[in-house]
Swiss-Prot record, chains A, B, C, D, E, F:
Its EC number is 2.7.7.1. Its main location: cytoplasm. This is Nicotinamide-nucleotide adenylyltransferase. Belongs to the archaeal NMN adenylyltransferase family. Pfam families: CTP_transf_like (PF01467). It catalyses: beta-nicotinamide D-ribonucleotide + ATP + H(+) = diphosphate + NAD(+). Keywords: ATP-binding, Cytoplasm, NAD, Nucleotide-binding, Nucleotidyltransferase, Pyridine nucleotide biosynthesis, Transferase. SUPFAM superfamilies: Nucleotidylyl transferase (SSF52374).
């Protein structure tokens, strides 16, 4: 069975990694959908889709996850919820299930007839992307403990922290 | 060095595969950009982006190419040539060069300051996507010899031939 | 005279029905424009355009309104207020007036030279779409009294209440 | 059962009317989808969506067809065939089948799991929209015999012939 | 009176310049609308909107035309003819007339209630943008005589000839 | 050197005028980019792009600024920050620098390799567009002192105050 795991991954944190591992114990192949691919350079969405693809890829390699079992595919938004499943389906190989806890994603895929796999709330209280981004914008290094080691490295290498600190300045 | 290899890959044929191998002798990582990602279900563009991603992936695996050196990323069209390079750049990891023989792609990436690597015209006379699609629509099995074995299999498995034969009927 | 009556109709309530009746006493034909047609599956816009068209149609039939005097036409948003009147005009038969109390709609149609018919604020304090949607999301059946009987039936038949309750869950 | 009947209806001719009648003998309700709604003012697509809605409505009334069994809904194009069914579905009430002879429409709805009803080729050799438009642009009144009487009247009333004759002039 | 003069100006030639002069004898201010602003880097549309703005500006200055009487404003396409006038109107100061010989432009502005000023066919047989572009792509310097001197200079300075020669190569 | 000065100019106020003058002491030509060109008829964005172009033009003329050194070019939004610089570049003549104090604009142009010229915060406490628009919507004439005289005149002439007062009414 092939399943989707959609998210914005701004950034890809340890909770996301736990979901990937949990999923790979249940499905043959996992398609990580990097959503809102067109967004970047804001405090809410600091990284480009390509930067997120790179960070996820490095994290998976660093964790020794078999890349032959994973696809990482950026998908831009479409401003029509009722066509979103069909839109995503265009960008990815055929799949049978979706891994998500998000209410909107669940409703849309259920109405489209897909199976929904709900992962446990891995470290939900600790790994919250909003908090991680707030620390990044403040330049507080505590964000580094919340993401896989390889993600922290690539984020620093790509200059994302400097970008976020600039973006958080006043006009 | 990381390089892009953009194409529509309708379908991914033996000439494309030769370019991938040629590129991987020259660069560290190759990003295969599956262009016109929004197109499908026409005789000119029969496969969805996700179907093309799957076909390319299977071909690379079948050829024993190291997946850690390759990214396969679908990118939709943007109706503005002068912003196309920046648009593509959003979807992919940072890169320094582009592998192409296409005049428009060359002009756009050169004007944007990228290095262009021009591969030899591998089997240009034999592997022409337009001809391959014509054979597919006719149901003539000669198309199978023009694509990597794994691509032929996945195309049949996905029902692309049946789709093309239906699409070529008269109203 | 033919007039437009634009709204989002999320959902079509008794105040809307009163406006339709008021209008049909003043004009020969009424075009009900179901706006923001691309929106659905959110707490703010739960129903698809087609579901809203169906609900309105059933309400009009149930009330014995002559369907030959009414058009129900979904229109998606255009992100340009100054071209919105021309955009709407494309989707509907020629018209001379617009029925509205909305300040933006009034300004845009007045600047375009159309007559504006301002209906009385029918049950404004009782029939507020925001409140109706809040009750629907809570599963509180009081919303049913605020919409025409046929609308309540079709909303339940289409599973809109279940959809809204799912959407209002936490991640 | 509710079924869709999609077309561009540039203009709605006697062959289209025959399909509507044929369909209403087989389904409870018919949704006439006026496609390419955004197109108008060209020789290929002379009428706006609203003008086409009006022409179809008048033809149905003139033929004594019960309007309670028919929906006429304009739908703009989406540049993604694989999401087109979901896009159309947003604009219309729930349906189970589609009435069409068009190969692309058939493939897309079949892949989406809908039943396809194929009507006979009513007067295919006589009622060809391309020919009708050519006569209209030439100002040759023979086009009038090819469309329902009410359509001919509304086309003349709306000034479509004059528009087409202007558009066919040389720069 | 203020009037529009819409065109693609690929490139701005001596016929266009004659229309500008003819117009400025009849109206107080002229708004030159550089249409299809999103197009560039093709043989049909080689120059970006900004390059065309620059070329027109230089030509007007070189001819001693008072810049206080002219606006040069790029406008992207909108894929909806019936909303095009409203779309253009958004980008430009209020105006009363349009200068054009193009049938579609005439029909659209006349239906919107604007006055149409039809200029004489200045050197129609000599100054044809299609022919000028063909000469440019061939590298034949005869194109230079067909455009104002300042336009020829800026085209060479911007590297447009080299771009067109590259674009006209075979894959 | 040619530089860009991007803004929304809702409306163009005395602080903006000071930046234009400051820039023209440092660069040869200034391109005033009227951003969010597609927005209008809201309290946040009351004026169309064309109305803003007209207001800026009148202000520059009234101040005796040489129009041969200035371009005023409307540019619509693109929903992709990482492609925004390339998008803007399409609409304007070639340039080397950008005049801005906006953090996002700085980050985007710096990442694209452009020089950023940061003007002093001219009358920052006095000339705040948000406050000016609030006064305009209230009908408080104090806004007139905050914009160049010619801008105040054209705003009144175009009926912008009346439009804003209408838009600020309750439904």
């Amino acid at each position: 069975m092939r399943a989707l795991f959609p998210g914005r991954f701004q950034p890809f944190h340890k909770g996301h990694l736990a979901v990937v591992k949990w999923s790979l114990e249940r499905v043959d192949e996992l398609v990580i959908v990097v959503g809102s691919a067109q967004e970047s350079h804001t405090l809410q969405n600091p990284m480009t889709a390509g930067e997120r693809v790179l960070a996820i890829r490095r994290a998976l390699e660093d964790e020794g996850i078999d890349l032959r079992k994973v696809y990482i595919i950026p998908v831009p938004d479409i401003l029509m919820n009722s066509a979103w499943v069909a839109h995503v389906r265009t960008y990815v190989p055929p799949f049978e299930a979706v891994v998500t806890r998000n209410p909107l994603v669940k409703v849309l895929f259920e109405e489209a007839g897909y199976e929904v796999l709900e992962p446990p709330p891995f470290g939900r209280e600790k790994y919250v992307a909003t908090n991680i981004r707030a620390l990044m914008a403040l330049g507080d290094p505590k964000w580094e403990e919340m993401v896989p080691r390889a993600v922290a490295e690539i984020i620093k290498e790509l200059g994302i922290i400097r970008r976020m600190r600039e973006l958080s300045k006043r006009d």
